[in-house]
Amino acid sequence: MRFTPAIVIAAFCSLAVAAPAAKAIARSPSEAVEDYVIPIDKKRGEAVEDYVIPIDKKRGEAVEDYVIPIDKRGEAVEDYVIPIDKRGEAVEDYVIPIDKKRGEAVEDYVIPIDKRGEAVEDYVIPIDRKRGEAVEDYVIPIDKRGEAVEDYVIPIDKRGEAVEDYVIPIDK
C-alpha cells in the first residue's frame, strides 16, 4: 500500500486528536464516551473527525472520496482490479485450486485428515485428559463465583448495565 501525504497527515491528525481522550472519560455517565472523546474544534464547532480528512480546495471534495484512482472509464480502479479472466469471472472466484480427481476446491480438504477420518482442526485443541474437556473451554480464568471472568470483566455501571451497552452513541 502506498502512503500518500494526505493519508499520512490524516493518520497523524487522528492520533494527535485522540490524546485528550483519557481526560474526557470522566464526564457524566449520561453521555456516551464516544460522544465526547472526539475533540471539538471550538472555532468551527465541529468534531475534528468531520474535517481532518484533507479537503481538496479545487474540487471541494474530501480527498478520501477520490484518492482511489479513477480510470478512463470513469470507474474506481478498486471496482475492477480483481483480474477478470476470459470467462468473464473474477479470478478470485476460482483461484482456489481445484483438485481434478475429486472435483473439490483444495481448501475443502487441505486440513489434514487423520486416520480417524476427522479433520485435525477438530481435535488439535489440547484435551485435558483429567477433565475430558478441550483446554479452550476452561482456560478463561474462573473466579470464586464459578463464573468465567470474561462474563463480567466488562465494567458494570450503577444502573446495572454493561458499559458497552450504552457507550455506543445514541442520536438524541
From Swiss-Prot:
- How does gene deletion manifest? Abolished the production of phomopsin A and does not result in the accumulation of any related metabolites.
Report the pathway entry.
Mycotoxin biosynthesis
What about PTM? PhomA is processed by several endopeptidases including kexin proteases as well as the cluster-specific S41 family peptidase phomP1 and the oligopeptidase phomG to produce 10 identical copies of the hexapeptide Tyr-Val-Ile-Pro-Ile-Asp, that is further modified to yield phomapsins. The timing and order of proteolysis of the phomA precursor and PTMs are still unknown. Two tyrosinase-like enzymes, phomQ1 and phomQ2, catalyze the chlorination and hydroxylation of Tyr, respectively. PhomYb, is proposed to be involved in the construction of the macrocyclic structure.
Q: Which residues get removed as pro-piece?
A: 19-35, 42-50, 57-65, 72-79, 86-93, 100-108, 115-122, 129-137, 144-151, 158-165, 172
| Keyword Repeat found | yes
Decide whether keyword Phosphoprotein is in the record: no
Signal peptide positions on this chain: 1-18
Q: What does this protein do?
A: Ribosomally synthesized cyclic peptide phomopsin precursor; part of the gene cluster that mediates the biosynthesis of the phomopsins, a group of hexapeptide mycotoxins which infects lupins and causes lupinosis disease in livestock. The phomA translated product contains a 10-fold repeated peptide embedding the hexapeptide Tyr-Val-Ile-Pro-Ile-Asp, that is converted into phomapsins. After being excised from the precursor peptide by kexin proteases, the core peptides are cyclized and modified post-translationally by enzymes encoded within the corresponding gene cluster.
The name on file for this protein is Ribosomally synthesized cyclic peptide phomopsin precursor phomA
Gene name per UniProt: phomA
